[in-house]
Amino acid sequence: MTKTAAVILAAGQGTRMKSALPKVLHPLAGRPMVAHLIHALGAVAPSRTVVVIGPGMESVADRVAPLPTVLQAERLGTAHAVAQAGEALAGFDGTVLILYGDTPLITPETLTRMVEARLAAEDPAVVVLGFRPADPLQYGRLITSPAGLEAIVEYKDATAEQRAIGLCNSGVMAVDGRVLFALLAAVGNDNAKGEYYLTDIVALARGMGRACAVVEGAAEELLGVNSRSELAAAEAVIQGRLREKAMEGGATLTAPETVFFSADTRLGRDVSIGPFVTFGPGVEIGDGVEIKGFCHIEGARVAAKATLGPYARLRPGATIAEGAHVGNFVEIKNSAVEQGAKVNHLTYIGDARVGARANIGAGTITCNYDGFGKYHTDIGEGAFIGSNTALVAPVSIGAGAIIGAGSTIARDVEADALALTRGPHEVRPGWAAKFRAHMRRLTGKN
């Protein structure tokens, strides 16, 4: 088995984000940027992964746990950052991937190609991931020859001829673990910033007589996120991928550009998704589900052939069983709607069970919170809840029971019973006309 390790550089302050949240924790498709890299690394199954963080970034350490983190106490450059992983990678003699926490769009396929290139017959010491950006102005150039990669030249130091080269440095590398830390130890800081640049290891490796190589990746994979606008650009890229994946997997998206997925959204076959639907993290949708427009779903499971929306909201803990209906302006939280049940209009179901084939009338509310605790409502199989009903939890409605419209139910109702609490119907003929006449005399108004 190929031995692989990874170092993720995540110590950057991210000042351009203007945020209290560390840059690498900003979410893309419902997942922190750094977590996208960790997920992509699964393709090469690293035996060790180390995340380099800066001072005050304990939240990053918490998020990447159980992966180990090492501290770059002073931000002295990328080579210095990688060197902080020396103890964690002591004795490792395989391929070390070096990634950046703010470059989250690299695909598993590209990482696999990087490792394969490192293990080629030429035995390159360093493999650099290059790309061809539409605007290459700011990037270092990769200087190649028939023998492979010769050097990386920063733009400010490049000649006019070198600046004309379109192949640019992404910073991502795969390095022979047997020489990585020796190369890093040889890097100097004789430059304008007084920093230790990781790019210098290419020339150092060539000076040792070792080959270096380039793998070319798509420019969109190497989009770095340093600002809110770049975060939005990265979101657009990943949403495009997720939409394509959904359609290739057998889902129909009526207006793909209006549907937003989380990275972990799971869709069955023949799912139909209308416009302006948003999937938060933790959603699983079964085969043949219809999701109409303007639904918002997070932390929920929906079984086969259920129908949602339009304008339905499923919150964490919602489970919708096969063939159930959740209609317009319905919110369901931490509740089970069982097989064939219908919750079709203007309803809140929270901390509840809606039994199979039960029917919940428009305007029904489960009153689950008293300001201190949440309480459960249980609605039995085949029960019928009339419109504009308040179910004051904790309360149980038996199977087959009928609740009259407009009721407030605060006590349990046995199976097959009728319960209603509204006052008796009263009609007073002519009363309205007499009232208006009386008020006109009092006010002098017509």
UniProtKB/Swiss-Prot annotation:
It is an enzyme of class 2 (transferase). Residues 229-249 are annotated as: Linker. UDP-N-acetyl-alpha-D-glucosamine binds at residues 9-12, 23, 72, 77-78, 100-102, 140, 154, 169, 226, 315, 333, 348, 359. This is Bifunctional protein GlmU. The keyword Electron transport does not apply. One of its GO terms (molecular function) is UDP-N-acetylglucosamine diphosphorylase activity. In the N-terminal section; belongs to the N-acetylglucosamine-1-phosphate uridyltransferase family. InterPro entries: Bifunctional_GlmU, GlmU-like, GlmU_C_LbH, Hexapep, Hexapep_transf_CS, MobA-like_NTP_Trfase, Nucleotide-diphossugar_trans, Trimer_LpxA-like_sf. Its EC number is 2.7.7.23, 2.3.1.157. Pathway: Nucleotide-sugar biosynthesis; UDP-N-acetyl-alpha-D-glucosamine biosynthesis; N-acetyl-alpha-D-glucosamine 1-phosphate from alpha-D-glucosamine 6-phosphate (route II): step 2/2; Nucleotide-sugar biosynthesis; UDP-N-acetyl-alpha-D-glucosamine biosynthesis; UDP-N-acetyl-alpha-D-glucosamine from N-acetyl-alpha-D-glucosamine 1-phosphate: step 1/1; Bacterial outer membrane biogenesis; LPS lipid A biosynthesis. Homotrimer. It is found in: Cytoplasm. Residues 1-228 are annotated as: Pyrophosphorylase. Signal peptide: none annotated. GO terms for cellular component: cytoplasm; membrane. Its cofactor is Mg(2+). The active site is at 345 (proton acceptor). The gene is glmU. One of its GO terms (biological process) is lipid A biosynthetic process. Acetyl-CoA binds at residues 362, 368-369, 387, 405, 422. Keywords: Acyltransferase, Cell shape, Cell wall biogenesis/degradation, Cytoplasm, Magnesium, Metal-binding, Multifunctional enzyme, Nucleotidyltransferase, Peptidoglycan synthesis, Repeat, Transferase. Binds 1 Mg(2+) ion per subunit. Mg(2+) binds at residues 102, 226. The keyword DNA damage does not apply. Catalyzes the last two sequential reactions in the de novo biosynthetic pathway for UDP-N-acetylglucosamine (UDP-GlcNAc). The C-terminal domain catalyzes the transfer of acetyl group from acetyl coenzyme A to glucosamine-1-phosphate (GlcN-1-P) to produce N-acetylglucosamine-1-phosphate (GlcNAc-1-P), which is converted into UDP-GlcNAc by the transfer of uridine 5-monophosphate (from uridine 5-triphosphate), a reaction catalyzed by the N-terminal domain. Residues 250-446 are annotated as: N-acetyltransferase. It catalyses: alpha-D-glucosamine 1-phosphate + acetyl-CoA = N-acetyl-alpha-D-glucosamine 1-phosphate + CoA + H(+); N-acetyl-alpha-D-glucosamine 1-phosphate + UTP + H(+) = UDP-N-acetyl-alpha-D-glucosamine + diphosphate.
